[in-house]
Amino acid sequence: MAEPARALRVVRIYLDGAHGLGKTTTGRALAAASTAGEGVLFFPEPMAYWRTMFGTDALSGILAASARCAAASHGSARARRAGAPRRRGRGGPGCVLPGQVRGPVLNFARARVRAAAPPGPAPGGTVTLVFDRHPVAACLCYPFARYCLREINAEDLLMLAAAMPPEAPGANLVVCTLPPAEQQRRLAARARPGDRADAGFLVAVRNAYALLVNTCAFLRAGGDGATAGTRWSGRTQMHWPRSQTPVVMNAKCAGAGLRDTLFAALKCRELYPGGGTGLPAVHAWALDALAGRLAALEVFVLDVSAAPDACAAAVLDMRPAMQAACADGAAGATLATLARQFALEMAGEATAGPRGL
């Protein structure tokens, strides 16, 4: 009888944050840091998918629709409706990919009634999967920024947030940050066509990620999305402002209060039909689903002001504190093939698998 493959420890890291910070550069530096037995697989942002796979440049269409909304007196209803399908489409690759990765990781775990990996080294070694963005970017943070600018309504935002796929055990989100002036400088230097760099939008995106970090801290500390929903009576509206005031990020990811979260920011009249005081059940269910997805994330914050190699080293230094999952040792080759295929089709580039897999 063939000897079973030794258990492989799988650490999944999603690099996320506002655009123009240097996430992709940090991800590539992480991939270059692969060593024997400690491979790093990089899943880049799917630029080729958005720009070439459908015969039209979908990314340019999304950005153009966004610009039209911004120019049309904070977004007319017609412009918002026209842009919604494109916004949902942008999340496609990121929403599908977790399911492909989940297969080889969780099939082994289910067979042993164990999903999370125990602490310490695994017999089959460790593989780190690094993703350039989590679905939370397309499904929540960027739509939320546009909601704050009154370019989309709360209904669209809730619909997009509810579409975020559930996470398998072992997901770690590293939210990248930069001082605003340095972000502007890097955006100008990369000069990507269609990049939206107006100050109001950048503040809104940074606020979205700050609230995301605070929300995850609130949930991990025992905060309950359902409780948050029931506390939203019409008489206790929090009136979180759709303003340009920067939100303070709970950088240590410690406990945060309800008022510092996305739940407070979504306390709005639009979700209460007819001016009622009770939150409709369907909205409460959507918010509870969102809370469940966010609670599964272990969140870290990283200032990426340093050189890419230093940022990559900082991420690797976070790994002992990160959650992990188990896979059969044979899954390493499957994951390496998946990473190569994704990089080739979604980013238009070939990438070699890491050493040690």
UniProtKB/Swiss-Prot annotation:
Main function: Catalyzes the transfer of the gamma-phospho group of ATP to thymidine to generate dTMP in the salvage pathway of pyrimidine synthesis. The dTMP serves as a substrate for DNA polymerase during viral DNA replication. Allows the virus to be reactivated and to grow in non-proliferative cells lacking a high concentration of phosphorylated nucleic acid precursors.
GO molecular function: ATP binding; thymidine kinase activity
Residues noted as binding ATP in the record, renumbered to the chain: 17-24, 186
Assembly and binders: Homodimer.
Any GO BP annotation: TMP biosynthetic process
Record key words, sorted: ATP-binding, DNA synthesis, Early protein, Kinase, Nucleotide-binding, Transferase
Catalysed reactions listed for this entry: thymidine + ATP = dTMP + ADP + H(+)
Positions of substrate binding: 192
Active site residues according to the UniProt entry: 45
Alphabetized HAMAP family for the sequence: HSV_KITH
One Pfam short name: Herpes_TK
Protein family membership: Belongs to the herpesviridae thymidine kinase family.
Name of encoding gene: TK
This enzyme's EC code(s): 2.7.1.21
The name this protein goes by in its record: Thymidine kinase
